[in-house]
Every structure is written in C-alpha cells, then in structure tokens.
Amino acid sequence: MWREQNSEIMIKDSIQEEIIEEFSMFDDWLDKYDYLISLSESLPVIAPEHKTDEYIIEGCQSRVWVDARLEDGKIFYSADSDAIIIKGLLSLLIRAMGGRTPQEVVDTDLYFIDAIGLKENLSPTRGNGLVATIKQMRLYALAFTKQND
C-alpha cells in the first residue's frame, strides 16, 4: 500500500529507521499520538498563497495542502493541515520523503508506516487521507522526473 507495485526490494534507510526507533520508545498509542502532535511543530509550513484548492489533497477528512519544489536535484515539500495530528503525520512523511531525488521519492518504500503500527491506529478516513497524501507527494516527484527528461 505504501509503495509502488513494481519495486520489490525493500531498502532500509536511516531516516525511516530513526522514525521506527523513536516510536518504539512509546508503549501505547496515546503517547504516540502525543508525539505526533509534538512533531507538528517541525512541519515545513506551506506558503499562505499556496493554501488554495490547487494544493489541497482530495480524500482527506481534514483540510490538507502539500506543495513541492526542486532544489539542486532534490525535492523538498511543505504542507499544512487544519488538524494537529495530521500536521504530525505530514511532518513524518516530509522527513521520510524530502531531501531525496525525485526518482528516489517515487521508488521509496515507506515501510515505517507499517513498522510503527500507524496503519492499524488510524481511522479508515484518516488512512485514506494518508494514502492520498503519499500519492500526491509521489506525483509531484514524478512530475519533476519528467521535467528532467
């Protein structure tokens, strides 16, 4: 669910391993939700002029905006949401996917989502929103790969 079907090799990466280690310090999901809320403070916030329908993620329970830019061959994301827990989720996604080449983003297996139990602990609508957000972030990356062709 969190990766493209054509990629069969799961490559561990240090950022996702750090996320897994951080979440392993908490015994229950109330503490993990508190941690997600604290992560919302580190979210690279989208520019106010980009909080428009053009940047909104369809399929999310909350309002979510995501933007991407390419700098020195690496993709960087900014985002915002009207829900604080979602801001924490966005912060995790940006941490795991940002600062990579567009092709790396397209190919990245976001295995940390299953490893920390996130999928099982989100409501179905929040889970659908997470999938929609990941899809949009990958679409931005794919568009940047096409620009470089």
Q: Model-flagged regions — what are they?
A:
Residues 99-116:
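Glycine-rich phosphate/pyrophosphate-binding loops
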Residues 9-63, 69-76, 113-149:
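N-terminal intrinsically disordered, cationic/polar leader segments
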Residues 89-100:
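Alpha-helical support elements that line or immediately flank enzyme active sites
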Residues 17, 87-88, 106-107:
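A generic alpha-helix surface/boundary motif
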Residues 83-85:
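Short, surface-exposed beta-strand-loop junctions and turns on beta-sheet-rich folds
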Residues 1-9:
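N-terminal amphipathic/basic-hydrophobic helices that include classical n-h-c signal peptides
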Residues 54-60, 81, 103-108:
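Solvent-exposed interaction patches of small proteins and small membrane subunits
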